[in-house]
Amino acid sequence: MNMLIKRVIAIKNPRGDDNNNNKLSDLETLTDKCTTCPLTLMRVMAFFVVSFMLFSVLFSLSVVLRDPPSDAAISSTTTLFQLNQGLGSDDFDSVELLNDKLLGGLLADGFDEKSCLSRYQSAIFGKGLSGKPSSYLISRLRKYEARHKQCGPYTESYNKTVKELGSGQFSESVDCKYVVWISFSGLGNRILTLVSAFLYALLTDRVLLVDPGVDMTDLFCEPFPDASWFVPPDFPLNSHLNNFNQESNQCHGKILKTKSITNSTVPSFVYLHLAHDYDDHDKLFFCDEEQLFLQNVPLLIMKTDNYFIPSLFLMPSFEQELNDLFPKKEKVFHFLGRYLLHPTNNVWGLVVRYYDAYLAKVDERIGIQIRVFDTDPGPFQHVLDQVLACTLKESILPDVNREQNINSSSGTPKSKAVLITSLSSGYFEKVRDMYWEFPTETGEVVGIYQPSHEGYQQTQKQFHNQKAWAEMYLLSLTDVLVTSSWSTFGYVAQGLGGLKPWILYKPENRTAPNPPCQRAMSMEPCFHAPPFYDCKAKRGTDTGALVPHVRHCEDMSWGLKLVDN
């Protein structure tokens, strides 16, 4: 430092006269005294750095204590879901915000993120997977994606299959085999059956093609990279898909009943009728002997409104593969649903706007899904009584104090947001008014919200189904869930969210049941119409008592569901 000062002075005084030399001498003396200056400056700088860091920590603590962050969402200032500015912000490249956007390897990388924002943004809500998928499942999904790319619409293999389908002549060896899923029934049923059909395709090395129906492309993103899963508009059988039934000559059940095809004959395609009204011959689909016949058929057309996966777990030919794919049996729909089902940007906008406005900044989110199977839309007092009896008895919601106007508890109250979904607004209004008119006994602040109330189910209306899909997804983002018996709407929400819900028993004679609800054994949906047949013994049997991981459902005594051993 001394040499630097001397050089500066030398430049300023090139003549070097005596007067200036005296000044230089004085300055040299001064600089000699400042040899310890760097140490002093360093100490001062260190003091300011430490002070700044301490201030930052104290400021952060004050923010956290004043407004505790939610476990399941980031604050509205960082959700980045400003739809009017475009959902596809580059800020989503941040590793911290994405929070393992690939869900532990379940999802494939390489998609155009802006085309389907929900695929990678769902992790922002803190709703990662409930558990870790097996490495075998992940590897099989990657292999399936490669097969789908090789065999998908308009590939060489697909074009060959379509050509042979038109001629009725199939070569003995085909590179690709297909299962075509027919869009059928309500949205909840369609979601459950879509996952069922995909698992069947995975088990049988087939490629899944999805009938777009009237609205599937408006609801769901493409799940597989580089190839569509939707049946092309020029598929030869498109005009017949909605007409197939049990009387069709290509129906598997009718083929067995009439013995119209021998084992040596391979039809160009077979129609599988697996809907709730299927008969005993149709149900033989779940026997290994019939799978041996079907494995040679190049194209299977499937119509179902049932989540039939539990019965696949009872088939010896699939047993080992399923055990390897899903060591935890209750997470089949959870893993496959999170892999396959990504809301389109329109639906995702509904989800994030509502979540950010009403659910993001609370301590706990509670979902209550009310479905009444009655010709009268309601609301019904006995249903309201049952909902309140369940939620208060199980301490899901706090009771109210009808004797006081103001709660006198001190401290920062805990906040709860209650999301109610129902075709009627009556239940929402009653619960909302209760928490408006009276304080809670616990001092908690309870907000009641309902996104829509359509009055009745409108299966074929596009925006109705978009809102229904958004509400299922919102329910899946809650911390505690209450669902209605028999409802596929609730099954989808619990499965996607990895939640074991409290299930409201189905009322009889318009009377609230006692007890009002029961905790689910697992997060898996219920198969409402399973077969009760022992394929090996060729006689009827209780299929809910054959293996430890397939049991009868809580809400439907004859149904089947997967549970952990």
Curated annotation (Swiss-Prot):
<keyword id="KW-0735">Signal-anchor</keyword>
<protein>
    <recommendedName>
        <fullName>Galactoside 2-alpha-L-fucosyltransferase</fullName>
        <ecNumber>2.4.1.-</ecNumber>
    </recommendedName>
</protein>
<dbReference type="GO" id="GO:0006486">
    <property type="term" value="P:protein glycosylation"/>
</dbReference>
<feature type="topological domain" description="Lumenal">
    <location>
        <begin position="65"/>
        <end position="565"/>
    </location>
</feature>
<keyword id="KW-0333">Golgi apparatus</keyword>
<dbReference type="GO" id="GO:0042546">
    <property type="term" value="P:cell wall biogenesis"/>
</dbReference>
<comment type="similarity">
    <text>Belongs to the glycosyltransferase 37 family.</text>
</comment>
<feature type="glycosylation site" description="N-linked (GlcNAc...) asparagine">
    <location>
        <position position="509"/>
    </location>
</feature>
<feature type="glycosylation site" description="N-linked (GlcNAc...) asparagine">
    <location>
        <position position="407"/>
    </location>
</feature>
<keyword id="KW-0472">Membrane</keyword>
<dbReference type="InterPro" id="IPR004938">
    <property type="entry name" value="XG_FTase"/>
</dbReference>
<dbReference type="GO" id="GO:0009969">
    <property type="term" value="P:xyloglucan biosynthetic process"/>
</dbReference>
<keyword id="KW-1133">Transmembrane helix</keyword>
<keyword id="KW-0812">Transmembrane</keyword>
<feature type="topological domain" description="Cytoplasmic">
    <location>
        <begin position="1"/>
        <end position="43"/>
    </location>
</feature>
<keyword id="KW-0961">Cell wall biogenesis/degradation</keyword>
<dbReference type="GO" id="GO:0008107">
    <property type="term" value="F:galactoside 2-alpha-L-fucosyltransferase activity"/>
</dbReference>
<dbReference type="GO" id="GO:0032580">
    <property type="term" value="C:Golgi cisterna membrane"/>
</dbReference>
<keyword id="KW-0808">Transferase</keyword>
<feature type="glycosylation site" description="N-linked (GlcNAc...) asparagine">
    <location>
        <position position="263"/>
    </location>
</feature>
<feature type="glycosylation site" description="N-linked (GlcNAc...) asparagine">
    <location>
        <position position="159"/>
    </location>
</feature>
<dbReference type="Pfam" id="PF03254">
    <property type="entry name" value="XG_FTase"/>
</dbReference>
<keyword id="KW-0328">Glycosyltransferase</keyword>
<comment type="function">
    <text>Involved in cell wall biosynthesis. Adds the terminal fucosyl residue on xyloglucan side chains.</text>
</comment>
<dbReference type="GO" id="GO:0071555">
    <property type="term" value="P:cell wall organization"/>
</dbReference>
<keyword id="KW-0325">Glycoprotein</keyword>
<feature type="transmembrane region" description="Helical; Signal-anchor for type II membrane protein">
    <location>
        <begin position="44"/>
        <end position="64"/>
    </location>
</feature>
<comment type="pathway">
    <text>Protein modification; protein glycosylation.</text>
</comment>
